[in-house]
């Protein structure tokens, strides 16, 4: 006789739990829109770091490169090689896009461990790496999707869409689904790895403040760099695939 009241009570409890938010966020109200300010603030910091580094690197170029100029030339050469390997001989126009993706994600990931975000106090929530937020990673993935659609359409025109019915029209649903899963996998892989890394460090620091978290932080820096490389490599591979028309 008490089954129905118990079931209702259980459902009510589950409903209450579903309304609980994990963490707090700081928002700006601009017009009728609610803007996630934390991500914008940290993204602007990362962009400022990148632009400042570029200005310093090209401010006074030398015929015989200095250490700083050598470093940035090495980074550029690395990005060019990555783009050429994945895209092919028509890689040139895509070097800025791939380079921007790689450097923004790399610096964003490292900023979570190296920049003292905690000293900046907000009315709600706290600052963290931009890639620690799903909004950032989804935006980067959607930009990548737009890029490889543009690459395919600019080279092949409307015949680009023939790839959806090749080698047989039976694969049409699977080929369409693939274009939805690409941005999903890109965004959730990056978001999950960065969020997990920061959570592990926070937990270890709260439990054992000294010594133990340091190796984990170094491991996190390594994996953060790898995640930036994976994202940039896949973005270049998708662009190359859309231009070549093979899977």
UniProtKB/Swiss-Prot annotation:
One of its GO terms (cellular component) is plasma membrane. It is found in: Plastid, Chloroplast thylakoid membrane. GO terms for molecular function: proton-transporting ATP synthase activity, rotational mechanism. Keywords: ATP synthesis, CF(0), Chloroplast, Hydrogen ion transport, Ion transport, Membrane, Plastid, Thylakoid, Transmembrane, Transmembrane helix, Transport. It holds the Pfam family ATP-synt_A. It is a multi-pass membrane protein. It comes from the Eukaryota. Its main location: plastid. InterPro entries: ATP_syn_F0_a_bact/chloroplast (IPR045082), ATP_synth_F0_asu (IPR000568), ATP_synth_F0_asu_AS (IPR023011), F0_ATP_A_sf (IPR035908). The chain crosses the membrane at residues 38-58, 95-115, 134-154, 199-219, 220-240. F-type ATPases have 2 components, CF(1) - the catalytic core - and CF(0) - the membrane proton channel. CF(1) has five subunits: alpha(3), beta(3), gamma(1), delta(1), epsilon(1). CF(0) has four main subunits: a, b, b' and c. Key component of the proton channel; it plays a direct role in the translocation of protons across the membrane. Belongs to the ATPase A chain family. This is ATP synthase subunit a, chloroplastic. It comes from Agrostis stolonifera. The lineage of its organism: Eukaryota, Viridiplantae, Streptophyta, Embryophyta, Tracheophyta.
């Amino acid at each position: 006789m008490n089954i129905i009241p118990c079931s209702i009570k259980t459902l009510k409890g589950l409903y209450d739990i579903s309304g609980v938010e994990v963490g707090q966020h700081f928002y700006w109200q601009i017009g009728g829109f609610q803007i996630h300010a934390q991500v914008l603030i940290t993204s602007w910091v990362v962009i400022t770091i990148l632009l400042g580094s570029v200005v310093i690197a090209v401010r006074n170029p030398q015929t015989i490169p200095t250490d700083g100029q050598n470093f940035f030339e090495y980074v550029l050469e690395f990005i060019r090689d990555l783009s050429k390997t994945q895209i092919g001989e028509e890689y040139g126009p895509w070097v800025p896009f791939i380079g921007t993706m790689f450097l923004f994600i790399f610096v964003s990931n490292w900023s979570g461990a190296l920049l003292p975000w905690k000293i900046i106090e907000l009315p709600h929530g706290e600052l963290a790496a931009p890639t620690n937020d799903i909004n950032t990673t989804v935006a980067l993935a959607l930009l990548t999707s737009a890029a490889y659609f543009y690459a395919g359409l600019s080279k092949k025109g409307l015949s680009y869409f023939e790839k959806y019915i090749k080698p047989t029209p039976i694969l049409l649903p699977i080929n369409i689904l693939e274009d939805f899963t690409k941005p999903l996998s890109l965004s959730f892989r990056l978001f999950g790895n960065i969020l997990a890394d920061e959570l592990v460090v926070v937990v270890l620091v709260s439990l054992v403040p000294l010594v133990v978290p340091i190796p984990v932080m170094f491991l996190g820096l390594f994996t953060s760099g790898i995640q930036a490389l994976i994202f940039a490599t896949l973005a270049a591979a998708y662009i190359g695939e859309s231009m070549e028309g093979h899977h």
